[in-house]
Design a protein with these regions (language model features):
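Conserved catalytic motifs of ABC-family nucleotide-binding domains
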Residues: 51, 98-110, 177-179
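Helix-to-loop junction immediately C-terminal to a conserved catalytic motif
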Residues: 61
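Conserved ABC transporter NBD signature motif
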Residues: 69-78, 85-89
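ABC-type ATPase nucleotide-binding domains, specifically the catalytic core motifs of the NBD
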Residues: 108-123
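Conserved ABC nucleotide-binding domain
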Residues: 132-151
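A short, proline-enriched helix->beta-strand linker immediately N-terminal to the Walker B motif
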Residues: 162-168
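Catalytic Walker B motif of ABC-type/P-loop ATPase nucleotide-binding domains
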Residues: 170-174
Length: 191
C-alpha cells in the first residue's frame, strides 16, 4: 500500500500459501509450505526430489488439495476446494512433453480450445496469430503445422496459448533439458 503522493508500487499477489501441508497417502511431503507468487514476476523453485515437484505442480493445477494451512488466490483467502477450482482456470504447465496437437495448425492449437466459439474461424485465427507475432516480436519463419516445429518453437506456441487463455501463472517444467542455452534465452526474453 502507498502513501498519498508516493508512487504506486503495489504488487498484485496471485497466490499465497502459508503453512501449507500436502500429503501423499499418510506421508507428509510438504509440512510447512510457504509461497508467494506475484503478477509479472518470474520465480524459480528447486525441489529435493521428483515426488515433491510432481505434487507441487499438481497442487498448482488444482489436482491436489492442501491438507492444512492457508491459501489466498488473487489476494482473497479461499477454501481448499475453491482455490483448486480457481487454480485449474489460472495455471498452465509447459513441460518437456508438448501438449500441442501435432496434426493441426499452430493457430488452431492456440485458439481452438481457448475460444468460446462453436465453430472454427481459421481466417480469424491466422489474423490473431499474426497480430500476436507482431505484438511479441516472434519470427515469421515457423512451420505451419505443429509436427514440424522445433522444441523451442513448441514452447513458444504453448506460451502464446497460455497468454491467449489469460493464464495468470505459467509453470515451465524442466524445459532446460529440451532447449539449448541460446533457445532458452530466446524463450525467457519472450516471457
Amino acid at each position: 500500500h502507498y502513501k498519498q503522493g508516493a508512487e504506486k508500487s503495489v504488487k498484485r499477489e496471485l497466490l499465497n500459501i502459508e503453512g501449507g501441508k500436502i500429503k501423499k497417502g499418510n506421508n507428509v511431503i510438504f509440512d510447512d509450505l510457504s509461497l508467494e507468487l506475484f503478477q509479472g514476476e518470474i520465480t524459480g523453485i528447486v525441489f529435493d526430489d521428483i515426488l515433491e515437484q510432481k505434487l507441487f505442480i499438481d497442487m498448482l493445477l488444482g489436482d491436489v488439495l492442501l491438507y492444512s494451512g492457508k491459501i489466498f488466490v488473487n489476494e482473497e483467502r479461499k477454501a481448499y476446494e475453491e482455490a483448486a477450482r480457481l487454480l485449474k482456470q489460472q495455471v498452465a504447465v509447459i513441460g518437456s512433453k508438448s501438449k500441442l496437437l501435432p496434426s493441426i495448425t499452430i493457430e488452431d492449437n492456440i485458439f481452438l480450445f481457448s475460444d468460446r466459439k462453436l465453430f472454427l474461424d481459421q481466417k480469424e485465427y491466422r489474423e490473431r496469430f499474426q497480430k500476436l507475432r507482431t505484438e511479441l516480436n516472434i519470427s515469421d519463419d515457423m512451420p505451419h503445422k505443429v509436427r514440424n516445429l522445433s522444441a523451442k518453437e513448441k514452447v513458444i506456441i504453448e506460451l502464446l496459448k497460455a497468454y491467449e487463455e489469460r493464464k495468470k501463472i505459467v509453470i515451465l517444467d524442466e524445459i532446460t533439458s529440451l532447449l539449448s542455452e541460446k533457445d532458452l534465452g530466446e524463450v525467457f526474453s519472450l516471457i
